[in-house]
Regions:
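Short, solvent-exposed, charged loop/turn and helix-capping segments
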Residues: 87-125, 178-190
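C-terminal amphipathic alpha-helix
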Residues: 31-87, 123-190
Length: 190
């Protein structure tokens, strides 16, 4: 029975769960309204990313289980290609969230809001990097579904992927700490 590597589950799947409080600005189109609009824009891209990311992970798990069960590895290469393509789509969606987050940092809002957006941007950047490496892993699997010849390279790639996801998780935690410390500026969205 061929054993391929098990992808660890991502500990943090991104979702900006906070909306910026408008405080006392009250100006339609002011920096707080702009910030809220930008966060909403980033959230839309991130929601689609999360859906595609989960779809890619499910496709990968199904292919991995089939290879390990002894099914034809060449047939599973197609499923791995599907996982890679879906992960690429997820990666593209996450790229779409980058710009609005950087625009929030440039607005004339409280320092804490800028720090929050900066931490989220760092998290998105780290996750984009990790997902790019995960796409590389899927490409390797397409060529060698049982990792007969590429196991060491795959393990190296996955080590880098895991480091990237850990970096992203740390940045998400920093952003959450900022939000928790500033509930008057950053309110939870339900």
């Amino acid at each position: 029975m061929a054993r391929i590597l098990v992808r660890p589950a991502l500990l943090t799947v991104i979702m900006l769960s906070l909306a910026l409080s408008t405080g006392c600005s009250g100006l339609l189109g002011g920096p707080y309204d702009q910030a809220n609009g930008l966060v909403d824009e980033a959230n839309e891209a991130i929601e689609e990313h999360n859906r595609l990311f989960e779809e890619a992970r499910v496709a990968y798990e199904e292919a991995r289980e089939a290879v390990e069960a002894g099914e034809d590895a060449s047939d599973e290469a197609e499923h791995i290609a599907q996982a890679r393509e879906t992960m690429q789509e997820a990666w593209d969606e996450l790229e779409e969230a980058r710009e609005p987050l950087s625009e929030v940092q440039a607005l004339d809002v409280e320092l804490e809001i800028g720090e929050y957006a900066r931490s989220l941007s760092e998290a998105v950047d780290a996750q984009i990097s990790a997902e790019g490496q995960e796409i590389d892993f899927y490409e390797l699997l397409e060529q060698d579904p049982t990792l007969e010849n590429g196991r060491i390279e795959a393990e190296d790639i996955l080590s880098e992927v895991d480091e990237g996801y850990e970096e992203a998780e740390e940045a998400y935690e920093r952003a959450q700490e900022i939000a928790d410390a500033n509930p008057e500026l950053l309110k939870e969205r339900y």
